Swiss-Prot record:
Listed InterPro entries: ChsH2_C, ChsH2_Znr, NA-bd_OB-fold, Thioester_dehydratase-like
Functional summary from the UniProt entry: Functions as a scaffold to connect the acetoacetyl-CoA thiolase and HMG-CoA synthase (HMGCS) dimers in the channeling thiolase/HMGCS complex, which allows for efficient coupling of the endergonic thiolase reaction with the exergonic HMGCS reaction.
Any matching Pfam family: OB_ChsH2_C
Presence of the UniProt keyword Protease in the record: no
Name used for this protein in its record: DUF35 domain-containing scaffold protein
Organism: Methanothermococcus thermolithotrophicus (Methanococcus thermolithotrophicus)
Length: 130
């Protein structure tokens, strides 16, 4: 069973942000007001491509308890093609990660919570192999 709050988060599953119709800047997660245009800007829902590159990363060896089974794993800031930067796990061999490699979002199991083992899903990034 997926927790209800996760089923209703467009950002969590589909990388949906907003784009300002006035200046064209893209935001993720979604915003209600454009920080550049302020009230002059009108925002619209925008589907991000999910493609980008590793901006920076860290390898996690001492995770929170719900991530113990994944250790070690990579957490990164990914700069998306549209501009926003997103923090997420990268599903890859820790020896094959480096700054600048191209990645894309993929739907993945994130973690299990509590005694009941409630599974949370969302996006992780995976290297794009050419």
């Amino acid at each position: 069973m997926v927790v209800r709050s996760w089923r209703h988060m467009k950002e969590r599953y589909n990388l949906i942000g907003t784009r300002c119709k006035t200046c064209g800047k893209v935001y993720f997660p979604s915003r209600t007001v454009c920080p550049d245009c302020r009230r002059k800007g009108e925002l619209e829902e925008f589907q991000l491509s999910g493609k980008g590159k590793i901006y920076t990363y860290s390898i996690v060896y001492a995770p929170p308890k719900e991530f113990n089974k994944l250790t070690p794993y990579v957490i990164a800031i990914v700069e998306l093609e549209e501009g926003p930067k997103v923090t997420a796990q990268v599903d890859c061999d820790i020896n094959k990660i480096s700054i600048g490699i191209p990645v894309e979002a993929a739907f993945r199991r994130i973690k299990e919570d509590g005694k009941d083992g409630i599974i949370s899903y969302g996006y992780k990034f995976v290297p794009i192999t050419e």
